[in-house]
Curated annotation (Swiss-Prot):
One of its GO terms (molecular function) is protein dimerization activity. Belongs to the MEF2 family. One of its GO terms (cellular component) is nucleus. Restricted to the somitic mesoderm of early embryos and to the body muscle (myotomes) of the tadpole. Expressed in all tissues examined in the adult. It is found in: Nucleus. This is Myocyte-specific enhancer factor 2D homolog. The gene is mef2d. Residues 58-86 bind DNA. Residues 3-57 form the MADS-box domain. Transmembrane segments: none annotated. Residues 1-100 are annotated as: Interaction with hdac9. Residues 425-434, 447-457 have a biased composition (Polar residues). May regulate muscle-specific transcription in the embryo and may regulate transcription of a variety of cell types in the adult. It binds to the sequence 5'-CTA[TA]4TAR-3'. Residues 173-215, 243-267, 411-498 are annotated as: Disordered.
Length: 498
């Protein structure tokens, strides 16, 4: 790459003239030095600038060179500007233009440096041709190192269509140097055998993805990872087990897995299971999975669409109502004899807000429950405090809701405290404020009753809080007349302020 040509004429700009003088003066002295060394000669330069300032250069000593000059009387070569211009014309140069030199003229334009630059450019071109265009395709397989306890159950799927092979996954997992602790912001779904499986992500439960029977959920993110915000199942639980669980849609857990739920396994990461077009989702979930799913309902819902599996709660402790924060506390255990059906879920969808809880909705729901249970066992009536569903400012202490239920031996436990989180208002799940703490004392056994809509076993429950007490009271047998039951229910529901 050549240097630009400049016109050889007087520079009018003072600053440019000074810069050019400094550069070319040093270049001239450098050329004189090279000539004196290469050819073993004595050189003296005497320069006066436009302001009559003297600059001189001598290869040895200026006085000695000047003395030899004054004493020399032999004919010699003497040139002026006109002679130089004439010589340049004869050699083919224009005489009016010259390359713009710089201070390091000889170093920059030496053949050695040009060869070095040319070789470096060729090496860079080879590297760019070899690696420059190697852009990874969208559908590529990459080894993923995640800490797991069961290598046979891992089979990740890429939305692009490529699958990670089992041998590649096994080789990556067996190398102890590749295993790293799970990060809170970016993790894979892992499977832990022997533990109850829970939904790994609210986004991974959508549509036809429930038909996977290999125990995994496809990743909703393009690169195969699931962020911690979109995958609540990957957050570590309080008992130290940081492995996330994935749901198995069509294979319910065995009874021994149900019995392994310890009383100290509290789930601080509560989420909502959402489904778009997932018909009959509750049919594939057993009671234990419903328990774990419902316990995760205290956090903010990650989806903005309506839920197709609404569940109503009749058992919530009034521990956090003084903050004025509504959260959904669902009944967290179900017996296998009283699994909810799609008709139950359709009727439960009316319990979306306190304003939509009317007498007709409750009567329709109770009538449907009576039709399903009239051929099994005698019915019993349990009065449940409505102050657990709505705030105390809308309902007297003595107002109760009569719920038809079917168990014979009822074991009522206390509901553990849920995290202090808010629910989004766009979901039809029950989001009711809890009553204040001062109402827990001085109430009748009817008001302090906190029961679930279906019976559950005591070994599947978590440890209750020590500062909260609940009592069972006023269990009336089903031998009472139907008219008395209806009149009592209407009288109690009249106090419900909607």
């Amino acid at each position: 790459m050549g240097r630009k040509k400049i016109q050889i004429q007087r520079i009018t700009d003072e600053r440019n003239r000074q810069v050019t003088f400094t550069k070319r003066k040093f270049g001239l002295m450098k050329k004189a030095y090279e000539l004196s060394v290469l050819c073993d000669c004595e050189i003296a330069l005497i320069i006066f600038n436009h302001s009559n300032k003297l600059f001189q250069y001598a290869s040895t000593d200026m006085d000695k060179v000047l003395l030899k000059y004054t004493e020399y009387n032999e004919p010699h070569e003497s040139r002026t500007n006109a002679d130089i211009i004439e010589t340049l014309r004869k050699k083919g140069f224009n005489g009016c233009d010259s390359p713009e030199p710089d201070g390091d003229d000889s170093i920059d334009q030496s053949p050695l440096m040009e060869d070095k630059y040319r070789k470096s450019s060729e090496d860079l071109d080879i590297l760019f041709k070899r690696y420059g265009s190697a852009v990874p395709a969208p559908n590529f397989a990459m080894p993923v190192t995640v800490p797991v306890t069961n290598q046979n159950a891992l089979h990740f799927s890429n939305p692009g269509g490529s699958l990670i092979t089992q041998s590649l996954m096994t080789s990556s997992l067996t190398d102890p140097r590749l295993l790293s602790p799970p990060q809170p912001s970016l993790q894979r779904n892992t499977v832990s055998p022997g533990l109850p499986q829970r939904p790994a992500s609210a986004g991974a439960m959508l549509g036809g993805e429930l038909n996977n029977s290999n125990g995994t959920c496809p990743s909703p993110v393009g690169n195969g990872y699931i962020s911690a915000r979109a995958s609540p199942g990957l957050l570590p639980v309080s008992n130290g087990n940081s492995l996330g669980k994935v749901i198995q849609a069509k294979s319910p857990p065995s009874p021994n897995q149900n019995s392994q739920l310890g009383a100290n396994s509290r789930k601080p990461d509560l989420r909502v299971i959402t489904s778009q077009g997932g018909k009959g989702l509750m049919h594939h979930l057993t009671e234990e999975q419903l328990e774990m799913s419902v316990q995760r309902l205290g956090g903010v819902s990650q989806a903005t669409h309506s839920l197709t599996t609404p569940v109503v709660s009749v058992a919530t402790p009034s521990l956090l109502s003084h903050h004025g924060l509504p959260f959904s506390a669902m009944s967290t255990a179900y017996n296998t004899d009283y699994q909810l059906t799609s008709a139950d879920l359709a009727s439960l969808s009316t319990f979306s807000s306190p304003g939509s809880l009317s007498l007709g909705n409750v009567t329709a729901w109770q009538h449907q429950q009576q039709q399903q249970q009239q051929h099994n066992q005698p019915q019993q009536l349990i009065p449940v405090s409505l102050s657990n569903l709505v705030s105390s400012s809308h309902l007297p202490h003595t107002a109760t809701l009569t719920v038809n239920t079917n168990p014979i031996n009822i074991s009522i436990k206390r509901e553990p405290a849920s995290p202090n989180r808010e629910r989004s208002t766009g979901t039809p799940l029950s989001c009711f404020s809890h009553q204040s703490r001062h109402e827990a004392t001085g109430r009748s056994p009817v008001d302090s009753l906190s029961s679930n809509a279906s019976s559950f076993e005591g070994n599947d429950r978590e440890d209750p809080r020590g500062d909260y007490t609940s009592s069972l009271g006023l269990l009336r047998p089903s031998g009472d007349t139907e008219s008395e039951s209806q009149s009592v229910k209407r009288m109690r529901l009249d106090a419900w302020v909607t």
